[in-house]
A protein has these predicted regions:
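Intrinsically disordered, low-complexity linker/loop segments enriched in Gly/Pro
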Residues: 1-23, 27-37
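Short amphipathic alpha-helical linker/capping segments at the junctions of internal repeats
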Residues: 41-50, 159-162
Length: 214
């Protein structure tokens, strides 16, 4: 992964924790994602901020520090992890300032922030693979380049507001499918709002696809 792509994620949330693993490798931890740092000298979080060009009087606006991976978050292989297919749904949605891509699992779906995926998506790799793994009661996505772990990324929490908007979108798509194949002369202006194919005449929320808190 390129340093500039990893730095972009850190700058977005102003979070920079430099984490050492048991093998002596270093990682950037933004609390939403962990990325392997390669081709760089050993550094502290202050060194990382200096590389970003953050002025001394602005560093106090960052959440930063050093940590050691005692829990084994960066362990290459974890018991029970399952390989995923990236973007099997073939769709992304924009919500609360994020572009979210669904990753299907055998028992649900994980919505992943594309900003967090960008550093690994832009890697020059033909062997990139995604794995579902558990971590302290939650599910994470581990990204490997061949046999080497390069990132561990948290999915976005699906709150009630997000689920409501997805349900509205699904219902509206079902309604629209009801008009497919209907000849234009068969549709009146009134039908467009109160047709028999409509599941509800309730007005669609004007903020659909925006707002809400994660």
């Amino acid at each position: 992964m390129k340093f500039t792509d990893i730095a972009k994620v850190a700058k977005r949330d102003k979070v920079c924790y430099i984490m050492d693993d048991v093998d002596g490798s270093q990682w950037l931890n933004t609390m939403d994602a962990v990325y392997r740092l390669e081709g760089l000298p050993k550094m502290t979080s202050d060194d990382f901020l200096n590389l970003l060009g953050v002025p001394e009087d602005k560093k106090n606006k960052w959440e930063s520090g050093e940590m050691f991976d005692e829990a084994g978050l960066t362990k290459t292989d974890r018991f029970g992890e399952v390989e995923l297919t990236a973007d099997p749904a073939g769709i992304s949605v924009f919500y609360n300032g994020m572009c979210l891509t669904p990753f299907y699992t055998t028992d649900g779906v994980l919505w992943m922030d594309e900003d967090l995926l960008e550093p690994v998506r832009k890697m020059d790799s033909k062997y990139l693979a995604f794995f579902l793994r558990g971590e302290k009661g939650r599910r994470m996505v581990a990204v490997k380049d061949g046999l080497i772990l390069v990132a561990v990324i948290s999915p976005v929490v699906m709150n009630d507001d997000f689920m409501d908007k997805v349900n509205i979108m699904w219902r509206k798509c079902r309604q629209e499918r009801g008009w497919e194949g209907v000849e234009e002369y068969e549709i009146s202006a009134d039908d467009l709002y109160h047709g028999e194919g409509a599941e509800s005449s309730e007005a669609e929320p004007t903020d659909a696809g925006h707002g809400g808190e994660d």
